[in-house]
Amino acid sequence: MANLERTFIAIKPDGVQRGLVGEIIKRFEQKGFRLVAMKFLRASEEHLKQHYTDLKDRPFFPGLVKYMNSGPVVAMVWEGLNVVKTGRLMLGETNPADSKPGTIRGDFCIQVGRNIIHGSDSVKSAEKEISLWFKPEELVDYKSCAHDWVYE
């Protein structure tokens, strides 16, 4: 199948604390994407610094790491046709004020510093992020019974 890919999605501490985990998972499942891995954890500062290494020179970096370390996160890997691009569209803009209603951030967020969810921005970054958060044996390969109803 063309463009079958995987993406990394993380529900941030504010999304967990606000009880939005089920709603977010529901949206990805209803779209037709397949969950292949999931963890509930409190990421260490060191792990978060690795994850956000491309932002290390930005003035908001220390606050971002502190915020992400402030509580548990739900780390997930989703698979599907064009899941990276479509997943980003489902999330909405990084700044919730620029997000359209119907997107996760458009429906549930107000400020950029509390935007409840992270999603890989490219296939390359998805591969990097997935390998940072999950071991290969933690990625479960299976065929969903809904597969033939979602894909031609």
Swiss-Prot record:
This is Nucleoside diphosphate kinase B. One of its GO terms (molecular function) is identical protein binding. GO terms for cellular component: cell periphery; cytoplasm; lamellipodium; nucleus; ruffle. It catalyses: a 2'-deoxyribonucleoside 5'-diphosphate + ATP = a 2'-deoxyribonucleoside 5'-triphosphate + ADP; a ribonucleoside 5'-diphosphate + ATP = a ribonucleoside 5'-triphosphate + ADP; ATP + protein L-histidine = ADP + protein N-phospho-L-histidine. ATP binds at K12, F60, R88, T94, R105, N115. It is an enzyme of class 2 (transferase). SMART domains: NDK. The active site is at H118 (pros-phosphohistidine intermediate). Belongs to the NDK family. The keyword Membrane does not apply. The gene is NME2. It comes from the Eukaryota. It is found in: Cytoplasm; Cell projection, Lamellipodium; Cell projection, Ruffle; Nucleus. Keywords: ATP-binding, Cell projection, Cytoplasm, DNA-binding, Kinase, Magnesium, Metal-binding, Nucleotide metabolism, Nucleotide-binding, Nucleus, Transcription, Transcription regulation, Transferase. Its EC number is 2.7.4.6, 2.7.13.3.
